């Protein structure tokens, strides 16, 4: 993840950046353990000459592999964060060394125990680094299968209690390693929707933090407590609980399943473009986040991924499997996660994605950010006259008055204006803007004739829903989990599993019908159909129509700014205000016994 927030002046935990999977800065270089391991052995176990040559070589080889693995792992942080080719060979070498190291310590455990003094927490460190490698590889490739591999190694550390003896040693830096392991494990579990494991880990982490701060006079207690608060808020962000008959919570997955996207009708002619790259940008003030991943970013991330499959056959017996250099088929679009990026950071990653975009492919830009509104008056209506969304600033505004006066005649610098995206419309571009100033992107101009669609959130919500904004945007929730969003606007906070599954089945029917409305429309802009061949984009489009139709029928959504918009505009009478779709929404409301909060005949009420 890109961490533009490092320059942010908002108070935040210094520990949080290390939770995103980014490689930590290595400590000051020390002499190799190889140089003095045998001398230590002599002093504790007899003369050096008494050590068999084979065992001496085993320790030497292990120390070499350990030092080499650390060197390669620390080098990961120097790799460019953008681009998809520069880093693959380095990752291959790193995986190769860790494969040898892991197998070597398994095969020679007794010798290493006796001659090297190998401790269980050191084995845990190796396993933790391997888990981090798989997590890094997931961030680089967006292949969710590698998350399962990271989970495999992190689980083994916990199940085998590799870190259990750390608390008995008077070394706070070892305890911090253990705490960071927990934090990374929680991130992986969140991404895999293993919420039951997350809750157990949070409890264990809380106990570990309490013990750590009690035993050592530390200065980071507040920061670790902030980590706990962040993850607690994150796992409670969903506004609706699905319950089993015994009142246990059902964990729902929002990744694309095999039958998730509505199928195209036989013979239907749509574009053959495929989603290849996505920039997911989060810069909302005060939104719940964990490990530099806001709730909105998390939800959009999952909306652009397929259900993961295991790479290894045995999850509880971790064995390293090196990622293939050339996967036969990319399951998921490649993604960059940018948390509070500066304008230059955002533009750098955008340019890298644009440069490497394959032929017949689409670049998606998702913006979840605070709106920036134009200051002063403007005689024109150009792409820099409507404001945009906020980008992060590198420094404090020292002279606020001077900045304010300058802004009366100049455009806001720390803002992504619609005009900033014009150069990238030379290739197919799909934009989703979730912001209080999303309408700034409504007046796009398609200069180059390439497919271009913008899905724009409402700029305001009814007062009853405004207090929930910290838990994520309603618009993004509709794109990620439309049924949960529908339940939320209907005032429902929990539901039995059986009813949930019944509603999901009906919603799949609604999505199929929406797909037909779009493909059968005679007046729809062809840009929408150009993107319709891709499963991810097709699902986003049908969910957008469902979201817009629901809000237009809901009695609480009465202002124009409460409705989503798009560029190009959709033909309302054939899509979001289609009587057939409105009937479906009323039927869904009837199943949930909330029909009274929707207009029976919305067309007559406008």
Swiss-Prot record:
Keyword DNA damage: no
Subcellular location: Membrane; Nucleus; Cytoplasm
Record text on subunit structure and interactions: Interacts with DIAPH1. Forms a nuclear ternary complex with MRTFA and SRF.
Cited function: Tumor suppressor which functions to suppress MRTFA-induced SRF transcriptional activity. May function in the RHOA-DIAPH1 signal transduction pathway and regulate cell migration through transcriptional regulation of ITGB1.
Membrane topology: Single-pass membrane protein
Organ and tissue specificity: Expressed in most tissues tested with higher expression levels in brain, spleen and thymus.
Protein name according to UniProt: Protein SCAI
One matching Pfam family: SCAI
GO terms assigned for molecular function: transcription corepressor activity
GO CC terms of this entry: cytoplasm; nuclear membrane; nucleoplasm; nucleus
Main location: membrane
A Gene Ontology BP annotation from the UniProt entry: DNA-templated transcription
Annotated region (Necessary to inhibit MRTFA-induced SRF transcriptional activity), positions in chain: 1-212
Biased composition (Polar residues): 1-12
Transmembrane segments annotated in the record for this chain: 472-492
InterPro entries: SCAI, SCAI_metazoan/Viridiplantae
Required for interaction with MRTFA: annotated segments: 71-173
Modified-residue entries (Phosphotyrosine), positions: 64
Xref: PANTHER family: PROTEIN SCAI
Presence of the UniProt keyword Cytoplasm in the record: yes
Region (Disordered), start-end ranges: 1-53
Family designation: Belongs to the SCAI family.
Keywords: Cytoplasm, Membrane, Nucleus, Phosphoprotein, Repressor, Signal transduction inhibitor, Transcription, Transcription regulation, Transmembrane, Transmembrane helix
């Amino acid at each position: 993840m890109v961490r533009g927030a490092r320059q942010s002046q908002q108070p935040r935990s210094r520990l949080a950046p290390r939770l995103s999977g980014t490689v930590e800065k290595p400590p000051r270089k020390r002499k190799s353990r190889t140089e003095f391991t045998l001398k230590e052995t002599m002093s504790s176990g007899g003369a050096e000459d008494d050590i068999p040559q084979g065992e001496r070589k085993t320790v030497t080889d292990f120390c070499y592999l350990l030092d080499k693995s650390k060197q390669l792992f620390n080098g990961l942080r120097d790799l460019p964060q953008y681009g998809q080719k520069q880093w693959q060979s380095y990752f291959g070498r790193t995986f190769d060394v860790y494969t040898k190291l892991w197998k070597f310590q398994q095969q020679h455990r007794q010798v290493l125990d006796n001659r090297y003094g190998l401790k269980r927490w050191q084995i845990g460190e190796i396993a933790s680094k391997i888990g981090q490698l798989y997590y890094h590889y997931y961030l680089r490739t967006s292949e969710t299968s590698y998350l399962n591999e990271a989970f495999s190694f992190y689980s083994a550390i916990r199940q085998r209690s590799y870190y259990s003896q750390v608390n008995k040693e008077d070394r706070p830096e070892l305890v911090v390693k253990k705490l960071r392991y927990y934090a990374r494990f929680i991130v992986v579990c969140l991404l895999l929707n293993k919420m039951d494991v997350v809750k157990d880990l949070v409890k264990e982490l809380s106990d570990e933090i309490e013990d750590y701060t009690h035993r050592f006079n530390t200065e980071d207690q507040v920061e670790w407590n902030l980590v706990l608060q962040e993850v607690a808020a994150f796992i409670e962000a969903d506004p609706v609980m699905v319950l089993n008959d015994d009142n246990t919570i059902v964990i729902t997955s929002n990744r694309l399943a095999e039958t998730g996207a509505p199928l195209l009708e036989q013979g239907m002619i749509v574009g053959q473009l495929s989603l290849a790259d996505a920039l997911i940008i989060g810069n909302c003030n005060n939104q719940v986040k964990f490990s530099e991943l806001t709730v909105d970013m998390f939800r959009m991330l999952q909306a652009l991924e397929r259900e993961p499959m295991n790479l290894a056959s045995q999850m509880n017996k971790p064995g390293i499997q090196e990622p293939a250099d050339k996967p036969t088929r990319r399951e998921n679009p490649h993604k960059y996660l940018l948390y509070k990026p500066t304008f230059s950071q955002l533009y750098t990653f955008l340019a890298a994605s644009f440069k490497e975009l394959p032929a017949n492919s689409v670049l998606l830009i998702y913006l979840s950010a605070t709106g920036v509104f134009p200051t002063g008056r403007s005689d024109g209506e150009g792409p820099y006259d409507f404001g945009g969304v906020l980008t992060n600033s590198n420094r404090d505004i020292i002279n606020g008055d001077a900045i304010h006066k300058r802004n009366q005649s100049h455009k806001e610098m720390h803002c992504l204006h619609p005009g900033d995206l014009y150069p990238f419309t030379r290739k197919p571009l799909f934009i989703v803007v979730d912001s209080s100033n999303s309408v700034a992107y409504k007046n796009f101009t398609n200069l180059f004739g390439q497919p271009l669609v913008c899905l724009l959130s409402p700029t305001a919500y009814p007062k009853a829903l405004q207090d929930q904004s910290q838990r994520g945007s309603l618009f993004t929730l509709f794109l990620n989990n439309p049924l949960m969003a529908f339940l939320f606007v209907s005032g429902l906070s929990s539901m039995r599993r059986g009813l949930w599954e019944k509603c999901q089945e009906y919603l799949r029917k609604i999505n199929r019908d929406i797909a037909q409305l779009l493909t059968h429309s005679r007046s729809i802009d062809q840009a929408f159909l150009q993107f319709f061949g891709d499963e991810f984009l097709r699902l986003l489009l049908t969910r957008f129509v469902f979201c817009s139709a629901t809000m237009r029928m809901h009695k609480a959504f009465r202002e124009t700014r409460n409705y989503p918009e798009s560029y190009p505009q959709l033909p309302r009478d054939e899509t979001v205000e289609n009587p057939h779709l409105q009937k479906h929404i009323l039927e869904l409301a009837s199943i949930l016994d909330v029909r009274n909060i929707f207009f029976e005949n919305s067309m007559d009420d406008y």
